[in-house]
């Protein structure tokens, strides 16, 4: 067929160009044309086998993936009645993981559409959990483990489950040929990758790296690439900004089979997916122990905290929309090995979620994570990350809790970093003007054995003091731990301030806050740290109007620190002390208006007394300021009159602004000459008096100019002469130029006239010659 086409083309060339083109020029043209045609056909033929090969590989991958997912779905769905799986609304992205109460879960993470942090969520229950998802959520693993890895590792050690979740966005089920109970979750597809690792590898996790490196694709080393469907838009796009998540205890390159390509190469083929990702960095002293229910309640190193925050109405910008919503949890990006905190961003969730024990709760319920501390002595474990769903209200609350042992205050001060308790430097940076930025930890519960019961949406400050009192009695008296509990969360609008820089940690004996200008007086009280809970209660409404700060002492007196009503809004920070000898001074930066909500224990009386004292002080200050202003005005008037008199001291005639027609400076009012004043007001002024006054004014103005100008006044004459000389030189140069131009033009004109005259003479002579010749 190819030869026939080539011969036909050659014959057509011979027919069209038999005479015009010679054979030496025809042959190279035909050869070039045929080679181009042959190359196009050859590339097309080579492309067909590749397409067929790709389609067969894709079909094989789909079949294998459907088989694996059916087996995993049977295992996961079998636990669904136990944990009461409940689907979420498809509008808000959220991944919720649950387990038994004695199993430490590591992360509950949610994904914001706007955030572009690459990342992953790692879960470590001892039994498989139930996962549900909607909208793009990306986790550590993209694929399912290979059977060779399962066989190799199951033959050596006893198995424990490490759940690695992957949720991808798709309006329908992941594969249309899936069977069984998985089709009931077709609107929220999810792939649960179950990797069997050894129990010994959990201890090995302490020294391994769990980090995120940019400029590589997300890959879990020993996962086969055949389980990825490269044609469907659910597969995650592996671009340069995506981070690599290396799971500890699993070699990412050693167990890779040679006939399988890397998952990142397969994922790179997809250019359609736009999913948002999270980076969850886990400290390296983390996944070590698995406490039982008894050890959770009895061991001093394990903290169980269940807390909920009431709904807080969000504060938005004027140009707010869904793409610009930003929660309070704004801070520095998480770093590898960070023991102090975990940063998360959340999109407002909708719908209901599962509680910690698996029972269905209201939309304001919470999903709580319990974490066992690490093996490293004295170092604390990362606390609880808690995501509160506030129903249809678009204001999520992120709660970070930091648990630590009594040893940790002295050994690792970075753990007790409370970003609402800075020392003098950070406090000054965060409270000047409107530049108030709340850190990502909006609620803390660092008590060792406390468990705050879940509250409804309306409870804000009523029952907190009783719970604090009970928690104080139940706390161990030998552990000097500063406890900050249930601080009301505050929503800060986007762009209202700059992020706080360098929040220092709370040392075992904190320094006194040195900002004396922020408060008129500080209330000091001694607090024994072994048995006293020193809370910091903040309530800030959506319009930033009400701000109240109280300190609870041993006698349980509330000492409010109030600000003036006209000052800009700022945060109120209390610095509690641990030692009983050091007093605690309350420093407040003023708020917009006085609080209209009062707590218990006679707060209204104290507040009214404070208000009266403040009003008295303000009145006294106002009177003093008015007196000072009057004195300043009198001084200025005296100075003006003195200067006028000085100007006219040299004048023999009556000086100053006397009325026209009156010769004396002071009219004789005492003698009853009021008629003279009335006549003087209508008298035409004499010219001599006006001239004298004008001369005095001009003389005073000249003296003032000389005094102010100083030595510059003596330079006016030479500067003027220099400027005049420069202008004269420029004028002379210009005039010379103009004269030369005129001379040149005149010379040209003269030449032109002479040439014309010569030509006329030549013409006349030629005519004469020609006429002579004719005759």
From Swiss-Prot:
Places the protein is found = Membrane
Chief location of this protein within or outside the cell: membrane
Q: Glycosylated residues: list them.
A: 76, 476
Signal sequence coordinates: 1-47
Q: Which tissues is this chain's protein expressed in?
A: Expressed in bone-marroew cells.
Provide Cytoplasmic-side residue ranges.
737-775
Biological process (GO) annotations? regulation of inflammatory response; regulation of TORC2 signaling
InterPro entries, sorted: ARMH4
What segments bear the compositional bias annotation Polar residues? 129-142, 577-599
Q: Where, in residue ranges, is this chain on the Extracellular side?
A: 48-715
Membrane-spanning residues:
716-736
The record describes the protein's role as: May modulate immune response and may play a role in inflammation. Down-modulates STAT3 signaling throught direct interaction with IL6ST, resulting in the inhibition of phosphorylation of STAT3 at 'Tyr-705'. May negatively regulates AKT signaling by modulating the activity of mTORC2 complex through RICTOR interaction.
What's the protein called, per UniProt? Answer: Armadillo-like helical domain-containing protein 4
Organism equals Mus musculus (Mouse)
Q: Which gene name belongs to this protein?
A: Armh4
């Amino acid at each position: 067929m190819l030869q026939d086409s080539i011969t036909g083309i050659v014959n057509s060339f011979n027919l069209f160009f038999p005479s015009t083109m010679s054979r030496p020029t025809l042959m190279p043209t035909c050869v070039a044309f045929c080679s181009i045609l042959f190359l196009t056909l050859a590339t097309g033929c080579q492309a067909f086998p590749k397409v067929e090969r790709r389609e067969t590989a894709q079909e094989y991958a789909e079949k294998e993936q459907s088989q694996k997912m059916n087996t995993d779905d049977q295992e996961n769905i079998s636990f669904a009645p136990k944990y009461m799986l409940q689907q979420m609304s498809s509008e808000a992205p959220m991944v919720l993981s649950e387990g038994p109460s004695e199993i430490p879960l590591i992360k509950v993470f949610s994904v914001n559409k706007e955030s572009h942090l690459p990342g992953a969520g790692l879960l470590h229950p001892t039994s498989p959990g139930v996962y549900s998802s909607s909208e793009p959520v990306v986790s550590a693993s993209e694929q399912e483990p290979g059977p060779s890895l399962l066989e190799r590792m199951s033959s050596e050690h006893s198995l424990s489950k490490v759940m690695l979740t992957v949720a991808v966005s798709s309006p329908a089920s992941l594969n249309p040929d899936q069977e069984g109970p998985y089709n009931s979750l077709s609107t929220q597809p999810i792939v649960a990758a179950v990797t069997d690792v050894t129990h010994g590898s959990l201890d090995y996790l302490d020294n391994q790296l769990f980090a995120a490196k940019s400029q590589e694709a997300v890959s879990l080393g020993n996962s086969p690439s055949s389980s990825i469907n490269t044609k469907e838009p659910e597969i995650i796009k592996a671009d340069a900004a995506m981070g690599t998540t290396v799971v500890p205890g699993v070699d990412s390159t050693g167990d890779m089979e040679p006939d399988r390509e890397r998952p990142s190469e397969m994922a790179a083929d997809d250019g359609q997916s736009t999913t948002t990702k999270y980076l969850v960095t886990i400290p390296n002293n983390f996944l070590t122990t698995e406490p039982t229910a008894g050890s959770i309640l009895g061991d001093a190193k394990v903290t169980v905290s269940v807390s909920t925050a009431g709904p807080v109405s969000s504060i938005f910008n004027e140009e707010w929309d869904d793409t610009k919503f930003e929660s309070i949890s704004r801070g520095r990006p998480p770093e590898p090995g960070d023991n102090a905190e975990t940063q998360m961003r959340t999109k407002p969730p909708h719908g209901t979620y599962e509680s910690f024990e698996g029972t269905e709760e209201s939309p304001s319920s919470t999903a709580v994570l319990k974490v066992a501390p690490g093996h490293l002595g004295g170092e604390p474990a990362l606390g609880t990350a808690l995501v509160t769903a506030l129903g249809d209200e678009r204001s999520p609350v992120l709660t970070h809790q930091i648990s630590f042992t009594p040893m940790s205050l002295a050994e690792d001060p970075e753990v007790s970093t409370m970003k609402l308790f800075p020392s003098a430097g950070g406090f000054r940076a965060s409270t000047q003007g409107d530049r108030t930025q709340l850190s990502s930890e909006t609620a803390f519960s660092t008590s060792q054995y406390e468990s705050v019961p879940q509250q409804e949406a309306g409870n804000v400050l009523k029952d907190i003091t009783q719970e604090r009192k009970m928690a104080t009695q139940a706390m161990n008296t030998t552990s000097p731990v500063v406890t900050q509990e249930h601080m009301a969360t505050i929503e800060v609008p986007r762009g209202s301030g700059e992020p706080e820089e360098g929040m220092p940690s709370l040392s075992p004996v904190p320094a006194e806050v040195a900002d004396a200008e922020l408060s008129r007086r500080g209330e000091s009280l001694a607090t024994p740290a072994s048995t006293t809970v020193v809370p910091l209660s903040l309530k800030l409404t959506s319009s930033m109007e009400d701000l109240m700060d109280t300190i609870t002492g041993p006698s349980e007196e509330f000492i409010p620190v109030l600000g003036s009503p006209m000052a800009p809004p700022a945060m109120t920070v209390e610095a509690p002390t641990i030692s009983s000898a050091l007093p605690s001074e309350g420093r407040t930066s003023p708020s917009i208006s006085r609080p209209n909500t009062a707590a218990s224990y006679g707060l209204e009386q104290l507040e009214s007394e404070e208000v009266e004292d403040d009003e008295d002080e303000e009145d006294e200050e106002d009177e003093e300021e008015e007196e000072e202003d009057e004195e300043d005005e009198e001084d200025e008037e005296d100075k003006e009159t003195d200067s006028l008199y000085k100007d006219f001291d040299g004048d023999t005639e009556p000086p100053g602004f006397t009325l026209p027609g009156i010769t004396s400076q002071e009219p004789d009012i005492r003698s009853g000459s009021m008629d003279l004043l009335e006549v003087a007001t209508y008298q035409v002024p004499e010219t001599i008096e006006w001239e004298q006054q004008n001369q005095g004014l001009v003389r005073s103005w000249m003296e003032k100019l000389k005094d102010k100008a100083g030595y510059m006044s003596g330079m006016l004459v030479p500067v003027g002469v220099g400027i005049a000389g420069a202008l004269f030189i420029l004028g002379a140069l210009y005039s010379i130029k103009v004269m030369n131009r005129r001379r040149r033009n005149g010379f040209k004109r003269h030449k032109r006239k002479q040439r014309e005259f010569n030509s006329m003479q030549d013409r006349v002579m030629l005519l004469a010659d020609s006429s002579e010749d004719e005759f």
